[in-house]
Amino acid sequence: ALTEVVRRYPNTRYAADARIKIDLVNDHLAGKEMQIGRYYQRAGRWLAAATRFRTVVETYQTTSHTPEALFRLVESSLQLGMPEEALKYAAVLGANYPGSKWYEKAYRLMQKHAPGVAVK
């Protein structure tokens, strides 16, 4: 319904309000995906966790949860024995969020667990 308001009446204050609400809903949905992914990580279900974090990166990439999701994908990939995949996520994290705490943590994690493919 909110996207319909934006589509039909793009230059109104209602559309602006609808865009804000859409962003808030997406951020909330991404937060729930993160919560479920973290639960799976704690349970040692790394593949299920990675699937949830990948959903955040692919579907909710404009939300505040994306940097953490990328970091969690680095963690999950390393746990699944895929250091090259972890490097890919760390590189995306470094390119898009170079000063973030999540990039710093990913960098240290890569150096510790996959020094042969460490992020530069």
Ranges and model annotations:
Residues 1-120:
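Acidic, polar-rich low-complexity tracts and alpha-helical solenoid repeat scaffolds
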